[in-house]
Amino acid sequence: MKKFKNYIEKNSERFLNELFELLRIPSISALKENDSDTRLAAELIKKHLLNLGLNNCEICETKGHPIVYGEKIIDYDLPTILVYGHYDVQPVDPINLWDKDPFEPYVKKTKIHPEGAIFARGSCDDKGQMFMHVKALEVMLDHGDLPCNVKFMIEGEEEIGSDNLEIFVKENKEKLSNDIILVSDTGMISKTIPSITTGLRGLSYMEVEITGPNRDLHSGHYGGTVANPINILSSMISSLHDSKNKITIPGFYDKVSESSDDEKKASSLIPFSIDEFEESIGINSIHGELGYSTIERQSIRPALDVNGIWGGYTDEGSKTVLPSKANAKISMRLV
């Protein structure tokens, strides 16, 4: 381990600069205007894989953003690890809540991170973790200590639902064959406790639109006589959870398995600090489905959240409009 540590310390500045180069690319998969940046990120990752001497490095086209692939086969009799990650990031709005340009990375010490942390869009979801595995492979290759075959599959659509990943996997079963998949998109229980994540929740995402009159109306004339789409949408959203914070959609829990006693016991033994959790996100009380711990709520229980809501007049000042429509974006974490 000492030789690995020495190599990392010797090359840490270069590692950081290379990561910063990747973080500066605004590879926002949800925005069409960022398509060229998203491809640029894919090309940079391919370049890093080539620099490590990986074989069959390619940018694999899909109907959306491309998937980067590369492999290092030492011996076909050895086990094979497939590293999964993604190079796309989420939109940065509202931009005014950022202290600095979200695509100009910097290191800052905070109360939560007294040793310093990298601040930038994608630094921890998922360019940072993904690049960590690329550099870990570099370290091992430099010392000739790679005990297995390694394949990389880095996609560019994770933040928008991975629409083309399933198709790619089905069409490339032989290429992607492996003994174990290492997902470089998870977290740790705490900064000092390494964690092995064995499962992740799935995602279903939708946009809801409620329509009313054929145009925006003046509430002084029409208020009280016409159904207001925002009122209807708000009522609908408020009805999605009951007083115990259970999701009220009929059939939602039909295929959700309850945790076994052994699983509950294992979950209770995880050294998870509620105080650290609350402090890290700036809250003073927890919330969620009654009867389950915070660990269970964020890992093995489904969840439904409204990710955005809009309609009517939202600019500065007042405008007594009765809107013609209202919209919301809703995500569901599935198990």
Feature names for model-found ranges:
Residues 111-112, 206-220:
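The feature captures the short pre-catalytic strand/loop hairpin that immediately precedes
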Residues 72, 210, 332-334:
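Hydrophobic beta-strand positions in extracellular immunoglobulin-like domains
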Residues 189, 198, 219-309, 321:
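Acidic-enriched catalytic cores of C-N bond-cleaving enzymes acting on peptides and small amides
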Residues 195-211:
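Flexible glycine/proline-rich, aromatic-decorated loop/lid segments
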Residues 1-95, 325, 329:
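N-terminal helical capping/dimerization or prosegment-like subdomains
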Residues 78-151:
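Active-site metal-coordination/substrate-binding segment of hydrolases
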